[in-house]
A protein has these predicted regions:
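Short glycine-/aliphatic-rich beta-strand segments at the starts of folded cytosolic domains
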Residues: 1-8
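Short amphipathic alpha-helix segments
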Residues: 8-24
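Short acidic amphipathic segments
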Residues: 21-33, 60
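A generic structural motif
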Residues: 37-42
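Charge-rich, low-aromatic oligomerization/scaffolding segments with amphipathic character
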Residues: 47-59
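Conserved short beta-strand edge segments in small beta-sheet-based binding/regulatory domains
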Residues: 59-66
Length: 66
């Protein structure tokens, strides 16, 4: 699944975002692309289940691929 981030992103956002996504699914593979402002997550969960974690970290995202 892939999410588009509407907020500005910096390289120091990568760690907190990865931890937030792994709080939803500890086995998830998370890839953050700061330049493209996208986050790819390989998980068996539904994309909607990650939206709360993004919101908790104050990121406004949309699902662009499920």
């Amino acid at each position: 699944m892939k999410f588009s981030v509407k907020n500005e992103m910096r390289s120091d956002d990568i760690g907190p975002l990865e931890r937030a996504m792994k709080s939803v699914d500890g086995d998830a593979k998370v890839a953050v692309d700061v330049e493209a402002k996208t986050i790819s997550i390989d998980s068996w969960l539904m994309p909607e289940e990650f939206l709360v974690a993004f919101d908790d970290e104050n990121y406004d995202v949309t699902i662009i691929e499920s």
